[in-house]
């Protein structure tokens, strides 16, 4: 077995629901009402996404996140 560390983007919507997005895995995301539930669901979602992407999976090096603010 191989151990992976995935960066996860966590956002909170207008209803207070947490949304977790895994940029390294196409289409891999989940949501939950609490952060602890989100962590559990993220592990489940990542495991499922890895099963799908097992053949061509390449993990990029995580550099960081930025928040860009602009007025248009």
Question: Where does each model-flagged region fall?
Answer:
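Structural detector for hydrophobic anchor residues on beta-strands
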Residues: 6, 18, 28-30
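ATP/adenylate-binding site constellation spanning eukaryotic-like Ser/Thr protein kinases
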Residues: 22-25, 43
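A short, exposed loop/beta-hairpin motif centered on an aromatic-Gly-Thr core
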Residues: 26-36
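Short aromatic-glycine-(Arg/Gly/Cys) micro-motifs in beta-strand/loop hairpins
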Residues: 11-22
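Short, charged, surface-exposed hinge/linker loops at domain edges
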Residues: 1-7, 11, 36, 40-72
């Amino acid at each position: 077995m191989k151990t992976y560390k995935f960066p996860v983007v966590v956002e909170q919507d207008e209803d207070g629901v947490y949304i977790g997005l895994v940029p390294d895995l196409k289409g891999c995301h989940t949501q939950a009402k609490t952060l602890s539930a989100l962590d559990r669901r993220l592990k489940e979602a990542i495991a499922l996404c890895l099963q799908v992407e097992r053949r061509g999976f390449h993990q990029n090096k995580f550099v960081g996140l930025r928040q860009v603010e602009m007025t248009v």
